[in-house]
């Protein structure tokens, strides 16, 4: 895989979504679940990675993050459903074992 950055969606313990971007998906997920990640996720642990999309640049990932964050929850759910062909979750599960 030749992705330099990722836009990702976490499902929090309370069922809410957190959307972010990173250049190191494994490290970022570990930071979130250690309680040292974003303030939003710290109060809603544990979090589960449900979507990750790769991009050629950090700027592209940041743009995708900003677009998805602006959507209301039903639109986010529609995006997640319609873009499963772009979801790298199975790649990460195979690479890391259980998420």
From Swiss-Prot:
Residues 3-78 form the GIY-YIG domain. Pfam families: GIY-YIG (PF01541). SUPFAM superfamilies: GIY-YIG endonuclease (SSF82771). PANTHER family: UPF0213 PROTEIN YHBQ. Belongs to the UPF0213 family. This is UPF0213 protein SP_1535.
